Design a protein with these regions (language model features):
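Alpha-helical transmembrane segments
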Residues: 18-27, 97, 169-176, 222-226
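Alpha-helical transmembrane segments in multi-pass integral membrane proteins
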Residues: 2-14, 28-52, 73-77, 81, ...
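Residues within membrane-spanning alpha-helices of integral membrane proteins
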Residues: 16, 20-23, 60, 67, ...
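Generic structural signal for small/hydrophobic residues in well-ordered secondary structure
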Residues: 61, 68, 88, 125, ...
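Membrane-interface helix-loop-helix regions
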Residues: 34-38, 43-58, 66, 74, ...
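Surface-exposed cleft-lining segments at the edges of enzyme active sites
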Residues: 138-142, 185-192
């Protein structure tokens, strides 16, 4: 393997920085906009920041792009068994610990919102509770079902011993998905041609360009993924206005999606890709448990104790609390899983 190829597969601090941007975008959306709009925190009203926080949900789109970027480089040389093992240890231990923590805290009797049932907990342990007609223990966890869909697709490719073709698969995936979308065939609701996969394939193609260079077809595919992602996200504006509250701007959504693509394309700049950022690796790793624990527990605290007078202090306190819980979860997970994950820990990416 050439030195350039080895260098392109090293962990990139800039990507971890983007993970931090993504997670705090999502947190701002949940606390400053979504919880208020849905009446989960009735004693707290919108703030001047809410108009911008309402677009923080697009941090999930950035996470999807990062997933594609990382996957095309990390999975190609793995066997089916290696991939399943790494993904299992990446997702499930932290998820189970987070569920137990959320269940325990949410079950305390003094919260305004009733705690979850044991049945909800059991089905959530699968990471796809809606398949059994159950709701998510934490509504923010819906993202994980899409991740599992993605991993199932990759595992099938590896099971067929076609990992070396992942680059071509992602490239064609973007082109076919774009055509499928704009021809209106998406009404068949095929999972893997959902708009979220526009972002996954876009991230993967950027990873391919970084590793192997530009080609005409990769540029066409990247453009296709961008157009697919842009229109599929912007077209949700009416749904957003009806279900999350009025005032969503198609222009702002489009600008954010464009910014996400540009931020990912910056990984092609050698100086940025090699930029050492102190603490970035830890912060990037922490983004996953932080995503898992922040929403329901933070919402409970704000609903119970939040007022117009203390809301900004409480937001800061809740974020600090979530970071502390996430740090503890990460340490506990490493202690429990260290006998099993010594070889795979370096592969921790989202």
């Amino acid at each position: 393997m050439s030195e350039n190829l080895v260098a392109s597969r090293k962990r990139i601090d800039y990507i971890d920085l983007l993970r931090v941007v993504a997670i705090f975008s999502v947190i701002s959306f949940h606390f400053l906009y979504s919880a208020i709009a849905r009446g989960r925190t009735p004693n707290v009203s919108f703030s001047p920041f809410s108009e911008w926080a309402k677009y923080g949900y697009l941090g999930v789109e950035l996470f999807f792009m990062i997933s594609g970027f990382v996957m095309v480089q990390s999975a190609r040389d793995l066997t089916f068994r290696q991939f399943i093992t790494k993904r299992f240890f990446r997702l499930y231990p932290s998820y189970w610990l987070a569920l137990l923590l959320i269940f325990t805290i949410a079950s305390f009797g003094f919260w305004k919102k009733p705690g979850p049932s044991a049945q909800e907990l059991y089905f959530n342990l699968t990471m796809f509770p809606t398949a059994f007609g159950q709701s998510w223990l934490d509504a923010a966890h819906w993202f994980l079902a899409r991740q599992l869909q993605f991993y199932v697709a990759i595992s099938i490719v590896l099971l067929l011993r076609s990992g070396k073709h992942l680059g071509a698969i992602f490239t064609w995936w973007a082109v076919i998905g774009c055509a499928w979308y704009f021809l209106g065939i998406q009404t068949f609701h095929i999972w893997y041609l959902n708009g979220f996969f526009a972002l996954i394939t876009g991230g993967a193609i950027i990873g391919l360009i970084r590793e192997f260079g530009f080609s005409r077809f990769r540029l066409i595919a990247l453009t296709a993924s961008y157009l697919w992602a842009l229109d599929s996200r912007v077209s949700k504006v009416n749904w957003l206005n009806q279900n999350r509250g009025p005032g969503h701007s198609a222009l702002i959504i489009g600008l954010v999606i464009t910014a996400i693509y540009l931020l990912m394309i910056l990984t092609l700049v050698a100086r940025i890709a090699s930029w050492p950022i102190r603490g970035a690796a830890f912060a990037g790793t922490l983004s996953y448990p932080l995503y898992l624990v922040h929403d329901r527990m933070g919402g409970l605290v704000i609903a119970q104790f939040g007022t117009e007078g203390n809301k900004y202090y409480l937001y800061l306190l809740v974020v600090m609390m979530a970071i502390a819980f996430a740090s503890v979860l990460l340490k506990v997970e490493r202690i429990i899983m260290s006998p099993f994950t010594t070889r795979s820990r370096s592969a921790k990416t989202l």
